[in-house]
Amino acid sequence: MWVRTTLRIERWTKEKTEDDTSSWDESSTDINRLPSWGRGHLLASVESSTDASTLSSEGEFKNTDRCCWKHKCAGHIVRPFSPDCVHHDVHLHSLSHCDCDSRLKDCSEKTNSSSGDVGPTCSRDVDSTCFDIIQSPCFELIPEEECVERFWYGWCKSYRPVSVAVIHHPIHHECGADDLNQEEEEEEEEESKPPIPTQVGPTPTDSPTDTGMSMITGAPDSAAPITIWRSESPTGKSQGNRVIKKIKKKKEKDKEEETDEKEKAKVKKKVKKGKLMKKKSPVKSESPPDLSRSLSPRELARMSESSPDSRQDLESEDSYNDPGREEPSSEDIVESSSPRKREKNGVQVKKPGLKTSPVKKINKRRSPPASNPNLS
């Protein structure tokens, strides 16, 4: 049942559109077939009635009425607040194809050119309200594919071509009356502009012997006086050139002086930086001199004998080197051990919290004990 109803609707719409196109042909000149509701809403100034039998009853604006009706009966129209061609019209006015809008514009221009009146006509008012004031956009149709059948898992099985409406900006109508108004405004502006003042030449009263610069005023054409500076001397041009050359030379000298000052300042900055670097450079710590080279062997021996351990080492080395030398006696050993005890006692007496500066003790080298002849 659903398929039959859809077929009937399509058939009815096709028959209706065919009847409309056959009845409203562009070559037809009779406008009485237009319904009253259609003619009344086209133009407010056009008097429409159901009893109209001739074209003369429509008045002077029958051509404009015909242009508007052709535009209204166009095939591709998107009604207000209705979706069509995959586009939902939200405007209060309907949207038509861009080709239909261009035809309406051409038709209105033809009616304006055919009319003998120079002033504004009804067609101009209609075009300005439709395109400039309301700014009704137009659309173009682009073919795209739409899915007709789908598989059970969601993929599309077959497609069909669908026309999609793409909206464009409205076409601005350039009315002939606007051009006339612009020309009138330009003429008014030219008239309101003040006349251009002309230069006044030198008066005959001026003496040719005067040299230098002189001001000449003549009969003023406008409110403000015009001043002209001139030099009457034959060498006036050469003098002016000399002055210009002097000024150029002064400027060049000033530039050279500025560059010299900048270079000097840069050199001074570099010198100051070099001095600061020298001051900041760390002082090299002098290495302690090699005592073994500067001191004599006797002084080295004395330094080594300052500690009792080194003394014992020296004595052991001497005994090893000199086999004929006798061993030290017990008294000497006791005497040598006594300074150790003294040092230990001195360390115990010192307080633990205080730091004492190290004191180097230098002991004189004692002569070795003489050999006793009686013992031998």
UniProtKB/Swiss-Prot annotation:
Domain of life: Eukaryota
Alphabetical keyword list: Phosphoprotein
Biased composition (Acidic residues): 180-191
Family matches, as CDD domains: PLA2_group_III_like
Modified residues annotated as Phosphoserine in this record: 319, 329-330, 367, 376
GO biological process: arachidonate secretion; phospholipid metabolic process
Entry-linked Pfam families: Phospholip_A2_2 (PF05826)
MF terms in GO: phospholipase A2 activity
Compositional bias ranges of the Basic residues kind: 243-252, 265-282
Compositional bias annotation for Low complexity: 202-211, 284-298
Biased segments, Polar residues type: 230-241
Gene3D superfamilies the UniProt entry points to: Phospholipase A2 domain
Family per record: Belongs to the PROCA1 family.
Name of the protein: Protein PROCA1
Native source species: Bos taurus (Bovine)
Gene (name only): PROCA1
